Amino acid sequence: MERIKELRDLMSQSRTREILTKTTVDHMAIIKKYTSGRQEKNPALRMKWMMAMKYPITADKRIMEMIPERNEQGQTLWSKTNDAGSDRVMVSPLAVTWWNRNGPTTSTVHYPKVYKTYFEKVERLKHGTFGPVHFRNQVKIRRRVDMNPGHADLSAKEAQDVIMEVVFPNEVGARILTSESQLTITKEKREELKNCNISPLMVAYMLERELVRKTRFLPVAGGTSSVYIEVLHLTQGTCWEQMYTPGGEVRNDDVDQSLIIAARNIVRRATVSADPLASLLEMCHSTQIGGVRMVDILKQNPTEEQAVDICKAAMGLRISSSFSFGGFTFKRTKGFSVKREEEVLTGNLQTLKIKVHEGYEEFTMVGRRATAILRKATRRMIQLIVSGRDEQSIAEAIIVAMVFSQEDCMIKAVRGDLNFVNRANQRLNPMHQLLRHFQKDAKVLFQNWGIEPIDNVMGMIGILPDMTPSTEMSLRGVRVSKMGVDEYSSTERVVVSIDRFLRVRDQQGNVLLSPEEVSETQGMEKLTITYSSSMMWEINGPESVLVNTYQWIIRNWETVKIQWSQEPTMLYNKMEFEPFQSLVPKAARSQYSGFVRTLFQQMRDVLGTFDTVQIIKLLPFAAAPPEQSRMQFSSLTVNVRGSGMRILVRGNSPAFNYNKTTKRLTILGKDAGALTEDPDEGTAGVESAVLRGFLILGKEDKRYGPALSINELSNLTKGEKANVLIRQGDVVLVMKRKRDSSILTDSQTATKRIRMAIN
């Protein structure tokens, strides 16, 4: 009070007022504050008083030659006085106007190339449609979103190297461009930016926008792909939203979307194979998305989705430390727990062994359509605050939280037996058994949970067992909030391990992910996904399996032929024949296999019965475990197009049609490729011509190793001996001639000698 009184007295004296308003500031501390460092302390004020001056801009001396002293209106454009402390000229803002109107022009051809991201944004906005504005409460939650549409996915370091290579190619410094994408981009950009006059720094900035994904942690309600985020300020406010449809798609969003679909398909397929982890890796390495190897995309793309993260873990990449349960991402924010096995009884008196988490913990739960905060103790839910788009989404979150809490009343609410299995027909673990059970029907769970009266808290209401809102009562411990729960913002990645069955654990041994968590949602990928692995042939149905199997045999016929005659068992066990088995009626599989294997053995034993087309046609049937029986078949059935189709043992059918004239194979009307060698009998002439320069010594001699194909003979050195597979599956021993003069006689004698050697 004393001080205020003192100040009032001071202010009443006219001298004080004069000092404060009229005199210059000469206090050292104040002068220091505003003059130390290069950083402007009050930019707005500085701008105002600068622009009030006549010549607020400084320019290089050369400006005096390039700009007249006065403009058409006779206003002065620059002052003859030098800028204090430098040898630059003081220039009026009018000079800028003059320059813009009358200054030199330059080629604009590079602008759309350098400012590509801006030009594309304008196009998207031009073709986008803005709908009506709705006023309603916006449940926004902060999510990590992609800010700049149309970027490649290089790491900051990779991009830096590319930018240096393109913009400053002559700068010193070690730069090694390793990845495929780096090399392609560098080549493309160098070509585009030849003779570009835009300042290199600007070009570098713009390239960075194009090459690196920029993410921000922003409050979003609605679409999270980058083409929505770029108009976030136009589409959602605190209490309003504007409908918007983007006027174009960008590759980075398409890559994210297609990557998720590919990863889900691969995880689902791997789950049902004999060695899920090995199969998953094989598929990831042989799959391309939009022409880029999936493993390259996985290394660079930060998308966090269950299937994508399982693939990353398998490749030894780090992933987020949050874990997944029931399609929600859980992140522990407080507390800790220890795990202990406990046996519990369901309402149906079935015993379940569950891993109980003992201790107090708090979690955030984030799903696509609902979010929640969960506080729990050992086998007890203390509080669940949930928010979601609609009743259905809120119910989903409540079920997941109730199961996760492991409360006794939840386990006692089970009616009937729990026997859910995964795609590979293995029983699910108890927690997922419970989850599936209540996801099917949660009525009993909600009825048995119990309700409690609630206090009136701002922004929170109760929810009843039938999922209707209430201000008086609510499910015990559960409240519905208007506010969403933010996604976990950290981008920290941790080292994880993965087991054979694709369960991903952190270094403390907690399971973060498992195939049960992979969504069953099917979507159409935006970019072409090319699965080269035979395990993915099934994805497009039985027809594709049939066509792909025969295409594979034809493509690899050279090696298949040798294996057929020498190591048939190895050939029958090839994984490429696995998908085919699902087409053969279960009851007939082993009978067909026994029949075909016997037939093949006869072909190997009896001269001249080798028939290329027939071997190709019947080979996939021999892959099943055979049953030794005397059964003969004139046709074999495959289940395609919803019914059984016959493949004739001798002759053509719609399911397998070989045209002798064109030498092409057609499967169900689709071209499956051409046979490069002549599959007709008695074509010894061809071989004798090829065998010129070789002396035929006699029957096959095992000491000289496995049989070579005719194409491989050229690798022999003079005088070297080898077994060679000729004609229709017969093997003879040959030696490469030491002299070239006798080559002519070879073709006549070859034919005779082949006959002798075989007989």
From Swiss-Prot:
The record marks 627 as: Avian adaptation. It is found in: Virion; Host nucleus. SUPFAM superfamilies: PB2 C-terminal domain-like (SSF160453). One of its GO terms (cellular component) is virion component. GO terms for molecular function: RNA binding; RNA-directed RNA polymerase activity. A motif (Nuclear localization signal) lies at residues 736-739. Keywords: Cap snatching, Eukaryotic host gene expression shutoff by virus, Eukaryotic host transcription shutoff by virus, Host gene expression shutoff by virus, Host nucleus, Host-virus interaction, Inhibition of host RNA polymerase II by virus, mRNA capping, mRNA processing, Viral transcription, Virion. Gene3D superfamilies: Polymerase Basic Protein 2, C-terminal domain. It holds the Pfam family Flu_PB2_7th. Belongs to the influenza viruses PB2 family. Influenza RNA polymerase is composed of three subunits: PB1, PB2 and PA. Interacts (via N-terminus) with PB1 (via C-terminus). Interacts with nucleoprotein NP (via N-terminus). This is Polymerase basic protein 2. It comes from Influenza A virus (strain A/Hong Kong/156/1997 H5N1 genotype Gs/Gd). The lineage of its organism: Viruses, Riboviria, Orthornavirae, Negarnaviricota, Polyploviricotina.
